[in-house]
């Protein structure tokens, strides 16, 4: 990594990060209700960087697992709502918020159960990336991918969005914070 890559995180405040794009911060949010992970919660969480094994069900195998992802998200404090995603042309977005899990917004449109599953799994990979960054940033999990998206977090999510069973297992192993 060159010196410019080291300085990039300092040049871009976290409040303007929306997965896949940079945007202005939203200042009319309610006060944070979910603190950053404490030391003990960090110790109990799974290893998000562990590469997905091929032993878990995929969206092709069981697209209904998307509903379990949504339930785990609610347990952890992720708000999922229907509406217009923050990024133009996207069917869903996750907004990483400093110090707490953010919301997922999903566009309501007809889609097959498998596509819906991959869409939801994709957004929860961004949740895992946010957890990997201790709710302070959105870090790569380190799962290898050949997906060509120029944004590394997006490439990682697109490259593994079919791995719903593994994403679900990581969310199920993630402890709730004390505010939940």
Language-model regions, residue ranges each:
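Alpha-helical transmembrane signal-anchor/signal-peptide segments
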Residues: 28-38
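N-terminal Sec-pathway targeting helices
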Residues: 1-13
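Long, well-structured alpha-helical subdomains associated
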Residues: 162-180
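Auxiliary, metal-adjacent structural segments of Zn-dependent hydrolase domains
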Residues: 17-20, 24-28, 42-104, 109-113, ...
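Post-HEXXH active-site segment of zinc metalloproteases
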Residues: 114, 118, 130-159
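Short active-site segment of divalent metal-dependent hydrolases/proteases
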Residues: 121-129
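Residues that scaffold the ATP/ADP-binding catalytic core of kinase and kinase-like folds
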Residues: 73, 127-128, 160
């Amino acid at each position: 990594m060159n010196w410019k890559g080291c300085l990039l995180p300092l040049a871009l405040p976290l409040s303007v990060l929306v997965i896949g794009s940079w945007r202005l911060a939203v200042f009319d949010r309610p006060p944070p209700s979910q603190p950053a992970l404490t030391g003990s919660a960090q110790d109990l969480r799974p290893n998000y960087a562990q590469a997905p094994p091929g032993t878990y069900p995929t969206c092709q195998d069981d697209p209904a697992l998307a509903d379990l992802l949504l339930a785990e998200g609610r347990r952890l404090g992720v708000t999922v709502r229907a509406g217009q995603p923050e990024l133009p042309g996207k069917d869903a977005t996750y907004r990483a918020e400093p110090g707490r899990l953010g919301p997922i917004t999903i566009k309501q449109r007809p889609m097959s159960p498998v596509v819906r599953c991959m869409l939801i799994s994709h957004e929860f990979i961004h949740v895992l990336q946010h957890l990997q960054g201790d709710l302070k940033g959105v870090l790569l999990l380190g799962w290898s991918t050949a997906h060509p998206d120029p944004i590394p977090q997006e490439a990682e999510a697109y490259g593994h969005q079919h791995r719903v069973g593994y994403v679900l297992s990581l969310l199920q192993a993630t402890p709730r914070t004390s505010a939940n």
